[in-house]
Amino acid sequence: MDRKKKAVYFKKVEEEPFARHMGIKLVDVDEGYAVCEMRYTDEMDNLYRNAHGGAIFSLIDEAFEISSNSHDRIAVALNMNVTYMKPPKKGSLLKAESKEIMRTRRT
């Protein structure tokens, strides 16, 4: 992916209201690939004072959104599955990497 096209995706994430609200930043993008990061803050706590699964899932979904749409065609998720292993530490930088493994026109 050329530099100009990458810049378009960085700008899209910077301007996306939800990504801004969550503090999600695009770190790298290529065709079928994206890396996003987000700092875990107190505002992302669940009622047990651990990271809310929805906050973590939002980071994952953002990386997926960018990688799957990096071919200039709108793509959507039909299904996503997450296994949460253990909660992150407060203030830690969370990272989501999305790699496309197959692209077809069929569902």
Explain the meaning of each model-derived region.
Residues 1-107:
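Terminal targeting signals and extreme-terminal segments of soluble enzymes
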